[in-house]
């Protein structure tokens, strides 16, 4: 069985409203019409939840504070940093009601400039996505092996310089991301 198979018959369903902008500030959210949809139990927005930051990956690298994932995410955010960022959530008695209510939520955004190139995003004056992190760099890590000072003295050494990147890698789950909880 998968996690979604374990939900009780009386379980409520939550659906998230994703921002349609690459970079924006949420100025206001009107949920009145969404709350009137039959079956809707609650609607929460980025203005309703506390600003408790957590790491994107959701786990620390180690117990060493200098080697942990950066707490840069919020459950719901008023500073949209990518297309699809989470700004509101609907809780309803079934999936259909939740989806209908999502369409009724009115969000006013202030669109902000954005860039699509990593190197451009790190340049001086680039749109800032992460408050408090200069040039949009949240963290830096490197791997060093050998002794560079000695190796550079070696005759015939070939020096290679350039910008190298790797594609995003994501392990693929057999099921969709989901969770369920209950109160005793």
Task: Put a short name on every predicted segment.
Residues 1-138, 162:
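Flexible, low-hydrophobicity surface segments
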Residues 147-184:
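Conserved beta-alpha junction segments in alpha/beta enzyme cores
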Residues 140-148:
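Flexible loop and strand-edge segments within Gram-negative outer membrane beta-barrel domains
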């Amino acid at each position: 069985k998968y996690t979604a198979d374990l939900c009780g018959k009386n379980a409520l369903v939550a659906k998230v409203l994703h921002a349609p902008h690459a970079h924006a500030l949420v100025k206001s959210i009107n949920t009145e019409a969404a709350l009137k949809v039959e079956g809707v139990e609650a609607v929460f927005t980025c203005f309703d939840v506390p600003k408790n930051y957590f790491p994107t990956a959701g786990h620390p690298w180690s117990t060493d504070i200098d080697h942990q994932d950066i707490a840069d995410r919020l459950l719901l955010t008023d500073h949209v940093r990518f297309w699809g960022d989470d700004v509101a959530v609907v809780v309803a008695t079934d999936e259909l009601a939740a989806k209908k209510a999502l369409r009724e939520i009115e969000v006013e955004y202030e669109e902000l400039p954005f860039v699509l190139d990593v190197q451009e995003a790190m340049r001086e004056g680039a749109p800032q996505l992460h408050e408090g992190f200069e040039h949009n760099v949240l963290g830096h890590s490197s791997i060093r092996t050998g002794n560079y000072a000695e190796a550079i003295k070696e005759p015939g050494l070939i020096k290679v310089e350039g910008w190298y990147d790797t594609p995003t890698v994501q392990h693929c789950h057999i099921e969709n991301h989901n969770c369920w909880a209950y109160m005793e």
